Amino acid sequence: MSAWIVAARRTAVVPRGGAFARLSIEDLGAPVVRAVLADSGVEAVDELVVSNALGAGGNPARRVALAAGLEVAGLTIDRQCAGGLDALRLAAALVESGAEAVLAGGVESYSRRPLRLATDPDGGAPVAYDEAPFTPWPDRDPGMAEAAARLADRLGMSRAAQEAFAVESHRKALAAVPAGIVELAGVARDAFPRRLTPAVAARAKGVAGSVTAATMAVAADGAAFCLVVGDKLAARFPRAMRIVAGATLGSDPLEPGLSAIAPMRAVLDRAGIGAGELERVELMEAFAVQAMATIEALGLDMGRVNPEGGGLAFGHPVGASGAMLAVRLFHGLRGGHGLAGIAGAGGVGAALLVQARDSTEPGRI
């Protein structure tokens, strides 16, 4: 039994405080879920798996399911940036164990995220925090921007090189015709891509070391979902994308920017596929240096990586970002193999290898 993605939709990605600022996670997620079901003609699913990193509990998947009119319990996962791809891997496992259809993806509202307070064991006033701890060791838990700056120093990647990468990401995003977007709050296009020039990038505010506001992804709101089904149901669809392999691995938490490399390499090795055989790669660009290091380490063809731009141009709706990669693969891959990869806080990375079935060959792979 194989697992297949047969429909995929997403919202636009909008920086926090923008057009989605008043929308809850169910406001973001439910319209996308309904659109996926409408596209597929599937009326009922066995489960809804939702990645969410900032919602502070309450089972967001159940809330999205109820808002979308689904009679499922809903399963929420939190693996931070890696969660969107993990949701798809869980959906594939459910299908391979007997489920007929599972919706999976992620939703994030940076704008509406709850405020978080750490209690004082000595009875003092609670202390607000914005970024959760990702390791049990305060001295080995660097901020993401700080870790990216250290990585750039170690690898000798200059600020100018990072800026050039960001400029190219925006250029590709502006030139692309996005597919699969569900219009929401009047927004039908990603809101952040702009005509970033080298001169403008050079004036960007420094964040940490050589990392600037131009070379790290902005915090954003958004949702993305895919419908995952088995062989029998997949045969009905002219376009389908088989989930070939997936992996989520832990690596050095001091260098989280490198954490996508091992799982991406693992799925390629498992399938016996070389990097040069990939038709398309969707790699999350949380930081320019992170994406550049991953591309170099795996020997990826730059012309096939993020051909419609990446996270530097779109933004980073944390729990939804991995699912966004899968949606872009679904709409952009016309044959052959595609790879999605994402690095995450705490040194966790995820990858998903897929193979597209050509629309002229229903039932074959």
Model region roles, listed by residue range:
Residues 1-26, 199-258, 262, 266, ...:
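Condensing-enzyme catalytic core mediating Claisen C-C bond formation in acyl metabolism
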Residues 10-11, 30, 161-234, 297, ...:
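N-terminal extracellular/periplasmic Venus flytrap/periplasmic-binding protein-like
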Residues 23, 51-100, 139-144, 195-218, ...:
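Conserved catalytic cysteine-centered active-site region
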Residues 25-40, 60, 64, 87, ...:
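Short, well-ordered amphipathic alpha-helical segments that serve as non-catalytic structural scaffolds
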Residues 79-108, 152-177, 226-233, 295, ...:
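Active-site-proximal alpha-helical scaffold in enzymes
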Residues 244-313:
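Active-site pocket-lining segment
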